Amino acid sequence: MAGIYARSWPSLFRLYMRCAGTRCSGHGWQNALESKGLLYFLPSSYLPIQAHIRLYSSSDQKEDGGSKGTSAASSPEKSMAGLDPSKPEQKSTFPPDPIQVKVKAVLKKREYGTKYMKNNFITGVRALNEFCLKPSDLESLRKIRRRSPHDDTEAFTVYLRSDVEAKAYEVWGSPEAIFRERKMRKEEEIAYRENLFRNQKLLKEYKDFLGNTKPRLSTTNMFMKGPGKVVIVAICINGLNFFFKLLAWVYTGSASMFSEALHSLADTLNQALLALGISQSARTPDPGHPYGFTNMRYIASLISGVGIFMMGAGLSWYHGIIGLLHPQPIESLLWAYCILAGSLVSEGATLLVAINEIRKSSRAKGLSFYQYVMQSRDPSTNVVLMEDAAAVLGLVMAASCMGLTSLTGNPLYDSLGSLGVGTLLGAVSAFLIYTNTEALIGRSIQPDQVQRLTELLESDPAVRAIHDVKATDMGMSKVRFKAEVDFDGRVVTRSYLEKQDIDLVLNEIRQVKTAEDLEAFMLKHGENIIDTLGAEVDRLEKELKQRNPEVRHVDLEIL
């Protein structure tokens, strides 16, 4: 008590007490602060400093009905009662009952830390590669069957990462030894690959041996139909046209004929590049290119557009300007007219082949001819179409300018024809560069197609809503679809319960007596429900691909 009397008022006010201030009825007393375990009186400045502390115990009461706290505070209460002369006896205001504390049972929160990997699963291949183990080392480990992430396979075996690490430490002794072994194996693998690249024949044999099980498309079949057929026909015809136009230019010296020869040469080289792009786009995906090589068609078409501008337009402008600055007399143009007429027929035939192919493809996609061309849905055929259209117009332009030169004897008209053909080629190259660049950047599919895919997902009972939909055209009639899905947890849980024995689940519930039993029950069924949710995602992806064959890659994220 002496310590309490000696303390200052500021220190007494800083006591951490949950209390409610009430007025004290005793004479000379200003305030009284009361808590469940502590009663503290604040005297006025006119009276000697006094403090009365009453402690309550939550233990059982004694047989006489009193408590330790009540007996301990009886004498101070009597002394306070004597302070008021009008009240000879003052009753105690303290509650006689002990404190009742109700404790809520909760599970202890587990601290996993910033890095927790004890519940991670890894496949057998990763265990062998990352921890340098042998198949015999995995036989003694716990094997767990999990749902496969692939649609066409069943459940597969995984191992706990902690078990694999413990086995690796048992085999190798320390993490440093594992790191050294992994580094040595990596060096051996690099040396092995270098040896393979030294012999192309062995490389092909080893690639086939190492598991490229998907059948490759036959190159012959690829160029016998569709865009491949159009490109091969264009290469043959433009190659012949270049040869004959070159002979006509050597014989006549016409600037327009020189521009047409360059035009045919540029078309031949560009279409050979398109054929290379078509063959490369059919390559099967590999670990370095998981989405395949379909963009090779757009890349080849883009380079083709640049080549048309550099070789065709640039040289045509150059030769036309030289003809304007230094006009040269032109020989007889009879052979040139014959070659132009033959080229017009051949280029027109190639143009008709390209038009028929685009018309058939656009009808299959439900698009108009103009939309199909402007959206560059088939870049290879589009290049052939634009080149042949420019070739036909260029032939008409060259023949007109050569005719004016023959009638007037002025070679300037022929030079103007060369400039006109160069301008036409520049416009074609600009169109090809723009459309293929847009396709390579990543272009969305048609809005009505996106709406149809979204409605297909929203019509499923397990889906509440679809958000952040992204559907991009990957080329070659392939679509990549991505969306965030808000699943209905009740439907997913009901789907899980439909596959369970309800009587067995009820029996498990009746056996739950403690918090630990409840935790084990929830962990077991919670993990199974998560697996059911993953199965629902796989089911939706599979249905989306089956109903829309153009959708090749689906990424559904759980919201």
Curated annotation (Swiss-Prot):
Signal peptide span: none
Catalytic activity: Zn(2+)(in) + 2 H(+)(out) = Zn(2+)(out) + 2 H(+)(in)
Compartment annotation: Mitochondrion membrane; Nucleus; Endoplasmic reticulum
Transmembrane segments: 230-250, 305-325, 333-353, 389-409, 415-435
Segments carrying motif LXXLL motif: 453-457
Protein origin, superkingdom: Eukaryota
Chain positions covered by the region annotation Disordered: 58-96
Main location: mitochondrion
Membrane topology (UniProt): Multi-pass membrane protein
BP terms from Gene Ontology: intracellular zinc ion homeostasis; regulation of mitochondrion organization; zinc ion transport
Key words, A-Z: Antiport, Endoplasmic reticulum, Ion transport, Membrane, Mitochondrion, Nucleus, Transcription, Transcription regulation, Transmembrane, Transmembrane helix, Transport, Zinc, Zinc transport
Similarity comment: Belongs to the cation diffusion facilitator (CDF) transporter (TC 2.A.4) family. SLC30A subfamily.
Name of the protein this chain belongs to: Proton-coupled zinc antiporter SLC30A9, mitochondrial
Organism, as annotated: Xenopus laevis (African clawed frog)
Lineage: Eukaryota, Metazoa, Chordata, Craniata, Vertebrata
